[in-house]
Amino acid sequence: MIYKSFLRPILFSLEPEYAHNLCLGLLSHPFYPFFHKLLASFQKDLPLLPKELWGMQFPNPVGLAAGFDKNGVGLRAWESFGFGFVEIGTVTPLPQEGNPAPRLCRLPKEGALWNSLGFPSQGAQRVAERLKKVFLSGRPKIPVGINIGKNRHTPLEETIEDYKKCFSYFKDLGDFFVVNVSSPNTPGLKSLQQKRFLELLFDRLNPLNSSPRKPLLVKIAPDIELKNLAGILEVLLRNESVGIVIANTLPAKGPGGKEGGLSGKPLRELSLGLIRFVKKETAGRLPIIGVGGIFSSKDAFEKMEAGADLIEIFTGFVYNGPSFPANLCRELERLRKTPQCSAIFLQD
């Protein structure tokens, strides 16, 4: 309540990207250890909702979606909020500024955010160095995923080299990896949501991905053609330790008719439909992370009922505040104890 009645109005009075970076800056500030302890005290009654995927333990199924902490600056904080895992990035091989401003705006009536960020990134080398420094004092207690992408000016025919470079930097740092081929804000990127490209990508990444093999997931767009999705699923099912993230932002025009993508409630039904499709097409053999429009435990449970093994939040976190992930876990624990919902949590 404090967030919605006091903090959110203050933050929403600020330019969106400035407010976002301000919050991330606070999480990396020298006084953060005190803040960390304060947050942790709020999570003492956080229930355990363990999930095992790819031989990896997730303390709960609620994760932070890619795009929120693009450079891993708040990595130590996320478990304090009650997240069961975090996906940082999208990280590109070389540093890049992304698209020009304005490139982020809030749409409160729609329960949405619009962005045209275009993968602003400090680059793989700098982000990897930051993670190494953080890990010197011990790895986080939650799995850390790395979302990797291509630089804007890399020709499409050289895209695989960009993914290889990123993967090589983070191979020993990330617990799992997500290949972003679906952002609407990088020219031509969505055209890579094709069976043939994914075959070539896995052929080039698999030799680098061993001892131990790290899970490699593909993030798809909410408006992907089902025939293309079916081809992607074929490729994924032929490989080991794979998965799919459903879904990225929905292409939409923003201020001044600028091209960008919507996240939040407008994605809810599209994401659910794709999750159900993938679950059916793969007979439940492919791990799914469901993203898009999760603002309540009902939304979260719908994703899991449709077939998602894990869920991620972003826009709902912005609108509901820092207590949202922990509250989601508490509500999911309550649902788990009800006869009509318990079967969903026992599918393992």
From Swiss-Prot:
Its EC number is 1.3.5.2. The keyword Flavoprotein applies. Binds 1 FMN per subunit. It is an enzyme of class 1 (oxidoreductase). GO terms for molecular function: dihydroorotate dehydrogenase (quinone) activity. GO terms for cellular component: cytoplasm; plasma membrane. InterPro entries: Aldolase_TIM (IPR013785), DHO_dehydrogenase (IPR050074), Dihydroorotate_DH_1_2 (IPR012135), Dihydroorotate_DH_2 (IPR005719), Dihydroorotate_DH_cat (IPR005720), Dihydroorotate_DH_CS (IPR001295). This is Dihydroorotate dehydrogenase (quinone). Monomer. It is found in: Cell membrane. Its main location: membrane. Pathway: Pyrimidine metabolism; UMP biosynthesis via de novo pathway; orotate from (S)-dihydroorotate (quinone route): step 1/1. Belongs to the dihydroorotate dehydrogenase family. Type 2 subfamily. It comes from the Bacteria. It catalyses: (S)-dihydroorotate + a quinone = orotate + a quinol. It is a peripheral membrane protein. PANTHER family: DIHYDROOROTATE DEHYDROGENASE (QUINONE), MITOCHONDRIAL (PTHR48109:SF4), DIHYDROOROTATE DEHYDROGENASE (QUINONE), MITOCHONDRIAL-RELATED (PTHR48109). Coiled coil: none annotated. FMN binds at A66, G67, F68, D69, K70, T90, N147, N180, K219, A247, G264, G293, F314, T315. It comes from Methylacidiphilum infernorum (isolate V4) (Methylokorus infernorum (strain V4)). Substrate binds at K70, N115, S116, L117, G118, F119, N180, N185, N248, T249. Its cofactor is FMN.
